[in-house]
Amino acid sequence: MARTPQSTPLLISLSVLALLQTSYAGGIAIYWGQNGNEGTLTQTCNTGKYSYVNIAFLNKFGNGQTPEINLAGHCNPASNGCTSVSTGIRNCQNRGIKVMLSIGGGAGSYSLSSSNDAQNVANYLWNNFLGGQSSSRPLGDAVLDGIDFDIELGSTLHWDDLARALSRIEFQQERGRKVYLTAAPQCPFPDKVPGTALNTGLFDYVWVQFYNNPPCQYSSGNTNNLLNSWNRWTSSINSTGSFMGLPASSAAAGRGFIPANVLTSQILPVIKRSPKYGGVMLWSKYYDDQSGYSSSIKSSV
């Protein structure tokens, strides 16, 4: 009897090995708007480094307040000086880069007093930054791709109502394109402030801030807390893509900066195995300009 070639176990072993080594490609998200020395939005997107840009911040809204956007030294919205940002938004979108308005931030005055208040804020965001036709659009007539929740202050209530209001089908049908929802929670799980919103499962991208929180950040050569926290977030939150949010330089945050060579050699090879891996988020464009961090990591992201 002829001997049957024993190739099947080898093929299975190779298949298992390939599965274990699967690595997903990602992109870099950047926050722009909080330093007048970081270049224009067009210049930011022309670098070719970024796949997502969050314009930061609409930091006053809700609870009956007149909403206000703060773009630091870039322009003065009080005199309609920020409408020219529309040119940059369109230039970025023409390059395939998604541009979101980030609401909240680490300083400001924002809260939601009720579900009706959340609906009113959603209407304002729609009419002034998304598909609506308000005559008072602070960033001009360009239509942004979505809204980023960077909720770091105040009450935990009604952020889920805001997410649902922004996601309602009538909004999206009206303009025939998707409204992206993104979020930047702090890494302690669950983040108590936007946690109710994240639990809706409506968010497309979640860029968790893995810094300024020692229990869940990189520290002194130790990646354990960081990677354990990453695994908890990616296994618990339903989103299209999970991003590792990092400071772009040691000056960008008090704690949690990861040297580029450590990120590319010890951390990215691990987190890129997750099917939910979306890439890396950096704070911010100004600090990235100073450090060249995105250039150092882009080919590995």
UniProtKB/Swiss-Prot annotation:
The gene is CHIT3. Belongs to the glycosyl hydrolase 18 family. Chitinase class II subfamily. Disulfide bonds join C45-C92, C75-C82, C187-C216. Residues 26-301 form the GH18 domain. Pfam families: Glyco_hydro_18. The active site is at E152. Defense against chitin containing fungal pathogens. It comes from the Eukaryota. One of its GO terms (biological process) is polysaccharide catabolic process. Keywords: Carbohydrate metabolism, Chitin degradation, Disulfide bond, Glycosidase, Hydrolase, Polysaccharide degradation, Signal. Residues 1-25 form the signal peptide. One of its GO terms (molecular function) is endochitinase activity. CDD domains: GH18_hevamine_XipI_class_III. It catalyses: Random endo-hydrolysis of N-acetyl-beta-D-glucosaminide (1->4)-beta-linkages in chitin and chitodextrins. The keyword Disulfide bond applies. InterPro entries: Cts1-like, Glyco_hydro18_cat, Glyco_hydro_18_chit_AS, Glycoside_hydrolase_SF, Glycosyl_Hydrlase18_Chitinase. It comes from Vitis vinifera. This is Acidic endochitinase. Its EC number is 3.2.1.14.
